[in-house]
């Protein structure tokens, strides 16, 4: 779980929105790219680090928070009297073929009253809500097929009082699909080949560790880093014919799915 220390002080109204977009490295109207949070195009988070505002990618946020940095630029004014503020940042990792972005997740603040409504679309740039009632609260989100929550920062639940500023960081990752290929060989006409003598290839999707591998009677399970239409084929082996291929040997595979292909060859 991500932890944040210190108090995030935020600006009000249009100034706040503009500052959040600027501090997170986004331009007005731009849609953050789905990705793994690394490299070119990643959305960056503003942190107050030793009195200086810096911007880092999401993978580095956790380490900075452990060392006492806080999310948000340095030196921002406090909330208005009699209110608190809660900022929700939604980060989405799509490194297994997913295409969802933060806006595809519906966020809800429970237990307290937020101006403008307690439910809103997620945003990598962050959505800041003025809180007008206080006490126990939690931040939840609607489930999105193919994605799982991987972390929620400490301020995604707890209690909030007048004058406080809190930041909730929710991170979801797309679930990799898996494909298991079982190779069966029947030798009832004098053949001596084993499953390992058959070279298997998965086509149409990207397989972590390589798309081609030796057959196995126990099954070879591979994780996919892309999804969609696929087929499983094998190299021809003299003296053997493909007797059957199960339904899982071709079709489409989606995020989080697990499919099994059984290929059976017989000596002729």
PLM feature segments, named:
Residues 31-77:
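Soluble extracellular-acting proteins and domains
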Residues 7, 70-71, 147:
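A general structural signal for well-ordered secondary-structure junctions
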Residues 26-29:
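Sec/Tat signal peptide C-region and signal peptidase I cleavage site
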Residues 2-4, 52, 126:
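N-terminal secretory signal sequences
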Residues 3, 77-82:
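Intrinsically disordered, low-complexity Ser/Thr/Pro-rich tracts
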Residues 1-14:
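Bacterial N-terminal signal peptides that target proteins for export
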Residues 18, 22, 80-268:
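Solvent-exposed loop/turn and edge beta-strand elements of beta-rich ligand-binding domains
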